[in-house]
Curated annotation (Swiss-Prot):
Record region (Disordered): 392-425
Stored SUPFAM superfamilies: E set domains, Voltage-gated potassium channels
Tissue distribution: Pancreatic beta cells and brain.
Family: Belongs to the inward rectifier-type potassium channel (TC 1.A.2.1) family. KCNJ6 subfamily.
Membrane topology summary: Multi-pass membrane protein
UniProt GO cellular component terms: axon; cell surface; dendrite; monoatomic ion channel complex; neuronal cell body membrane; parallel fiber to Purkinje cell synapse; plasma membrane; postsynapse
BP GO annotations: cellular response to morphine; potassium ion import across plasma membrane; regulation of monoatomic ion transmembrane transport; response to electrical stimulus; thyroid hormone metabolic process
Assembly with partners or alone: Associates with KCNJ3/GIRK1 or KCNJ5/GRIK4 to form a G-protein-activated heteromultimer pore-forming unit. The resulting inward current is much larger. Interacts (via PDZ-binding motif) with SNX27 (via PDZ domain); the interaction is required for recycling to the plasma membrane when endocytosed and prevent degradation in lysosomes.
Motif window: Selectivity filter: 154-159
Pfam families: IRK, IRK_C
UniProt-annotated location(s): Membrane
The protein, known as: G protein-activated inward rectifier potassium channel 2
Length: 425
């Protein structure tokens, strides 16, 4: 009985909601460790480690935004931009509206043609050869509906023909012809834009499954890989990245999805890509980087998401195309590097996309970039890149002194030689 109460109380603690669950508290709360039997009795759906809970994505791997708009009261705004609304609809609804619009217009004008014939009395003089109807051979609603289709689609079979003794029919013919042209232009244009949308072009723009953090040119860098599967290239391709992470301001305001720019070469022009073969996009982790204070041990505890956006123009159509993807904490590998995919063959370069997502482990410090910089400045970490750079700087200074004062250097060498001779004597 005591064990059951203990299990129930621990379950309530783990399932309890907290208003400040997204705000990091400076006070560490240590939960008592349960006996093994009590831990086994806990429900399996309860996680004992909150750091291992799944992070909710803001942008999915396929590029679709995981956001649903609710309680939208001003729905009339969608009707003010009816063309964009129709283009954004799914194909099944778009085709249904396409068929319904034409069917309704045919039925509407067919009903009007039948009413004109009925009011004029054409239905009562069908077999009277001396009677001049509004539309010849129109003897019911079905024939009026067929005449409406022939008029709007300009088929013109010639069996049903409007006569010159019916001015209201002539006016209706003009109205239906004009409205039919407008409907054709609107619906065909909508279908054309729907078909020519560059969304499917983004399907052949691929991103690596994981992002990696490793050393590159003596600096800690965050890297991911992008590629284009088509032979027709993306013109004016550019890449940018955003960090999505919760934030609490100094005034106490909580921002659940704060967006921070990640520099992937904006100031140097490296963000503009010539995407003929797969490229590795690199972000240098420096003082301006949001990853400046994140180490290997701290990375799994962070709840963050990196959204990458690749934009460019489709070479065939000239329309702007955008591809998106994202990386959560579990998809960022510390101490790994991408496997090369480009090889030189006989007269051409070959890309092996089987190795596009592959990574291999490499030697990488587990400290954060800030800690590495502090240790390098205090000369407590014998980093090869810092030592070599200091030696190079010392050699350059000596070379500059020799070029500026060659006479002083000659006198200095002469004095040294005289001192050596005196010491020998």
């Amino acid at each position: 009985m005591t064990m059951a109460k203990l299990t129930e109380s621990m379950t309530n603690v783990l399932e309890g909601d907290s208003m400040d669950q997204d705000v990091e508290s400076p006070v560490a709360i240590h939960q008592p460790k349960l006996p093994k039997q009590a831990r086994d009795d806990l429900p399996r759906h309860i996680s004992r480690d909150r750091t291992k809970r799944k992070i909710q994505r803001y942008v999915r791997k396929d590029g679709k935004c995981n956001v649903h708009h609710g309680n939208v009261r001003e729905t009339y705004r969608y009707l003010t931009d009816i063309f964009t609304t129709l283009v954004d609809l799914k194909w099944r609804f778009n085709l249904l509206i396409f068929v319904m619009v034409y069917t309704v217009t045919w039925l509407f004008f067919g009903m009007i043609w039948w009413l004109i014939a009925y009011i004029r009395g054409d239905m009562d003089h069908i077999e009277d050869p001396s009677w001049t109807p509004c539309v010849t051979n129109l003897n019911g609603f079905v024939s009026a509906f067929l005449f409406s289709i022939e008029t709007e689609t300009t088929i013109g079979y010639g069996y049903r023909v409007i006569t010159d003794k019916c001015p209201e029919g002539i006016i209706l013919l003009l109205i239906q012809s004009v409205l039919g042209s407008i409907v054709n232009a609107f619906m065909v244009g909508c279908m054309f834009v729907k078909i020519s949308q560059p969304k499917k072009r983004a399907e052949t723009l691929v991103f690596s499954t994981h992002a990696v953090i490793s050393m590159r040119d003596g600096k800690l860098c965050l890297m991911f890989r992008v590629g284009d599967l088509r032979n027709s290239h993306i013109v004016e391709a550019s890449i940018r990245a955003k960090l999505i992470k919760s934030k609490q301001t100094s005034e106490g305001e909580f921002i659940p999805l704060n967006q921070t720019d990640i520099n992937v070469g904006y100031y140097t022009g490296d963000d503009r890509l010539f995407l003929v073969s797969p490229l590795i996009i690199s972000h240098e982790i420096n003082q301006q980087s949001p990853f400046w204070e994140i180490s290997k041990a701290q990375l799994p505890k962070e709840e963050l998401e990196i959204v990458v956006i690749l934009e460019g123009m489709v070479e065939a159509t000239g329309m702007t195309c955008q591809a998106r993807s994202s990386y959560v904490t579990s998809e960022i590998l510390w101490g790994y590097r991408f496997t090369p995919v480009l090889t030189l063959e006989d007269g051409f370069y070959e890309v092996d996309y089987n190795s596009f997502h592959e990574t291999h482990e490499t030697s990488t410090p587990s400290l954060s970039a800030k800690e590495l910089a502090e240790l390098a400045n205090r000369a407590e970490l014998p980093l090869s890149w810092s030592v070599s750079s200091k030696l190079n700087q010392h050699a350059e200074l000596e070379t500059e002194e020799e070029e500026k004062n060659p006479e002083e250097l000659t006198e200095r060498n002469g004095d040294v030689a005289n001192l050596e001779n005196e010491s020998k004597v």
